[in-house]
Amino acid sequence: MPTDHMDLLARLRSLSAREREVLEMASRGMTNTQVAGELHVSVHAVKFHLAGVYRKLSVANRTQATMLLYSFGAGQGAGLWPSEVRD
């Protein structure tokens, strides 16, 4: 998992809007099926987007991805991505 703040910022910025959306939902504890239903896409599409998240963030699973998201001040309760990521 990346530890340098600037490296993490670059990795978070590399996520597509859909990858960010899927990661936010997954970090709130939603299952792939629930995310798919909410976004009106297939479960396969959700898995595809999560695989992209894992690759871009250099993590192995949704728990590690969520930990990175929370460590940067985003995630459950925040509702928004940090401005450094959204820009």
Task: Describe the residue ranges of each PLM region.
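A cross-family signal for key residues in well-ordered alpha-helices
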Residues: 24, 37, 67
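Recognition helix of helix-turn-helix DNA-binding domains
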Residues: 31-64
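The N-cap/first-turn positions of alpha helices
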Residues: 18-19, 47
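Regulatory hinge/linker segments at domain boundaries
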Residues: 1-18, 24, 78-87
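Basic, Lys/Arg-enriched C-terminal extension of HTH/homeodomain DNA-binding domains
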Residues: 9, 55-87
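Pre-recognition alpha-helix immediately N-terminal to the DNA-recognition helix
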Residues: 20-21, 64
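Short helix-to-turn junction characteristic of helix-turn-helix DNA-binding domains
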Residues: 26-30, 69
